[in-house]
């Protein structure tokens, strides 16, 4: 099945800014998050949205995608080699020019692979940060042979077939004459070493797989999809090389009352008709507790109030966002006869047409409810 266009997945224009891409991603991530959306295809859609965001939010990846689409020539090549339709061309190219490139020392120190760990956070955990411990499976240097793969007291021998280079020169006859093609040595598997007496602990691999507990300090203000690099906590390196890094990717659960956009928090409070018409002082929940908010007389539904400094702290420690409180007027469903009579009286005073409800509208309302 062919992949959908990333711009189509996020519903953004090809000239969309990073901020627009981020906003679209947050909206869709909340919609398809498996913890919220229980539909069968929600998880697949969530992953599709995440994949599109990872590409379009990175300037270099976006540039490659804009040029090549899903047929990026950088994909499909690397440590594992090319595959599929490129295989035939690769073989021909190797035949005339020699595969494998220049000589590399197979025993040179090599950095270990990076690891990725996905951590799910509650909404407020992402806002305020937390210290936690995770456990990950990873390869570590064998403590018995110290990475050599050989039994203690012995050492690996240099491969006699490739002379320690890890590569063999293979001569081939072609229509253009005899050519030399360089291949990985199949005797030492490219390591340049032969281990006759293997370490019993790691079976000659030089590495063992263990579960490692790592302390993680989640920074306050971390957002959905962001990642934290933990240096040196990836897979073990080879031949004395440094370990890779661990990247912790965060998924933040939605909140039942608050919504987040960057460092700002949004919420909606229901108010009665008399509250917005006459004015009131209400208590509004914030991330740090309740605060009082004055509702001016005549407030319209949809009006938004800003609570400065009540949002999310900047993940880099540069200030804090605001909280936006939007008013929603709730229409009463079960009125008493007395309340209905008051509303009829008010309707008669106001005229019932919006164009007639001028500056004296709320004065009439006050009189109706106060019995003046």
Curated annotation (Swiss-Prot):
Keywords, sorted A to Z: Chaperone, Cytoplasm, DNA replication, Metal-binding, Repeat, Stress response, Zinc, Zinc-finger
Start and end residues, zinc fingers (CR-type): 129-211
Entry annotated with the keyword Chaperone: yes
A GO biological-process term: chaperone cofactor-dependent protein refolding
GO CC, alphabetical: cytoplasm
InterPro entries to which the protein is assigned, alphabetical: DnaJ, DnaJ_C, DnaJ_domain, DnaJ_domain_CS, HSP40/DnaJ_pept-bd, HSP_DnaJ_Cys-rich_dom, HSP_DnaJ_Cys-rich_dom_sf, J_dom_sf
Binding site for Zn(2+) 1: 142, 145, 199, 202
Cofactor binding comment, as recorded: Binds 2 Zn(2+) ions per monomer.
Localization (cell): Cytoplasm
Record-level Gene Ontology MF annotations: ATP binding; heat shock protein binding; unfolded protein binding; zinc ion binding
SUPFAM superfamilies (alphabetical): Chaperone J-domain, DnaJ/Hsp40 cysteine-rich domain, HSP40/DnaJ peptide-binding domain
Subunit details: Homodimer.
Protein family membership: Belongs to the DnaJ family.
Role noted for this protein: Participates actively in the response to hyperosmotic and heat shock by preventing the aggregation of stress-denatured proteins and by disaggregating proteins, also in an autonomous, DnaK-independent fashion. Unfolded proteins bind initially to DnaJ; upon interaction with the DnaJ-bound protein, DnaK hydrolyzes its bound ATP, resulting in the formation of a stable complex. GrpE releases ADP from DnaK; ATP binding to DnaK triggers the release of the substrate protein, thus completing the reaction cycle.
Protein name in UniProt: Chaperone protein DnaJ
Organism per entry: Shouchella clausii (strain KSM-K16)
């Amino acid at each position: 099945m062919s992949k959908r266009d990333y711009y189509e997945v996020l519903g953004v224009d090809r000239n969309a800014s990073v901020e627009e891409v981020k906003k679209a991603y947050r909206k869709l991530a909340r919609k398809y998050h498996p913890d919220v959306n229980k539909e069968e295809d929600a998880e697949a859609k969530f992953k599709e949205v995440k994949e599109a965001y990872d590409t379009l939010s990175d300037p270099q990846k976006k540039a490659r995608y804009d040029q090549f689409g899903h047929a990026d020539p950088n994909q499909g090549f690397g440590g594992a080699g090319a595959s599929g339709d490129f295989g035939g061309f690769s073989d021909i190219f190797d035949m005339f020019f020699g595969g494998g490139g220049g000589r590399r020392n197979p025993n040179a120190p090599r950095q270990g692979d990076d690891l990725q760990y996905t951590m799910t956070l509650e909404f407020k955990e992402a806002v305020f940060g937390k210290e936690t411990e995770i456990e990950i499976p990873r390869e570590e240097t064998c403590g018995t042979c110290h990475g050599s793969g050989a039994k203690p007291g012995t050492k690996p021998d240099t491969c006699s077939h490739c002379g320690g280079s890890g590569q063999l020169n293979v001569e081939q006859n072609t229509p253009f004459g005899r050519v030399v093609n360089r291949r990985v040595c199949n005797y030492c598997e490219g390591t340049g070493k032969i281990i006759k007496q293997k370490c019993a602990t790691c079976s000659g691999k030089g590495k063992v797989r263990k579960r490692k507990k790592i302390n993680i300090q989640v920074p306050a203000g971390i957002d959905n999809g962001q990642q934290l690099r933990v240096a040196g906590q990836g897979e073990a390196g080879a031949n004395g090389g440094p370990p890779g890094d661990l990247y912790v990717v965060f998924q933040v659960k939605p909140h039942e009352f608050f919504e987040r956009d960057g460092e700002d928090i949004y919420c909606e409070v229901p108010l009665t008709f008399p509250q917005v018409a006459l004015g009131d002082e209400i208590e509004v929940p914030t991330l740090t507790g309740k605060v009082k908010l004055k509702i001016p007389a005549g407030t319209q539904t949809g009006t938004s109030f800003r609570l400065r400094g009540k949002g999310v702290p900047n993940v880099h420690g540069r200030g804090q966002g605001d909280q936006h409180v939007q008013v929603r007027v709730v229409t009463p469903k079960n009125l008493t006869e007395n309340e209905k009579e008051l509303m009829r009286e008010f309707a008669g005073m106001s005229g019932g047409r919006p164009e007639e409800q001028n500056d004296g509208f709320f004065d009439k309302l006050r009189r109706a409810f106060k019995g003046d």
